[in-house]
Amino acid sequence: PTLLYYFGFLTLAGRNEWGELKLTIPNQVIRKLYVERLREQALPHYEDQEQRQAIVERFYATGDLGPLCDLLEQTYFKVFDNRDLRWSNELVVKTAFLVTLFNDTFYLMDSEPALERRYADLLLRVRPDMRQDALLDHLLKFKTVSLKNIGLNSAELAATTREALRTLPIMVEKLQEAEQKLAAYRETLERAYGDTLRLQTHAVVCI
């Protein structure tokens, strides 16, 4: 972190409750460099990048989450072993989605936007000069569930379809929690932006 600070890739952001210095990404240009580097590491081949581009463009225009989730499962999350996955949380999932979806030409990307003292996870708001195109605004809320809580081992999980997983009680509960929060966030955003907003909301629960 010290070297990144001296090179200008991180900047001071005050202190935490313990008096320790906090560092943050200084601006959108540096944020884009981080995202592009992470994306190159996760998808090193040209064919992978082309596939990602096609999938995210489909998501931007339609809100189709299925192919995007498939891509993340087959690429980003494969780099984690079982020990890594034990410590994964909503931040890990959000980072994977942010890196995959990041496009500052089309969108104003906001991680954890403040919505009347509440925080959503990821907002993709179409840039004003791109509103004439077939782009939708997107708001995502992430939840995570452990294998222990759903009562499956890794082999059983791999053999279970996404549709079957959605019917498990803990998954139903988490999806409902996320959808309730998204409904409240939608009201706030629609009051702020009115008819210009074409908002799609997405509840994502990751095991």
Features from the language model and the residues they span:
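Nucleic-acid nuclease catalytic cores
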Residues: 169-207
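Extended alpha-helical interface modules used as scaffolds for assembling large macromolecular complexes
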Residues: 1-178
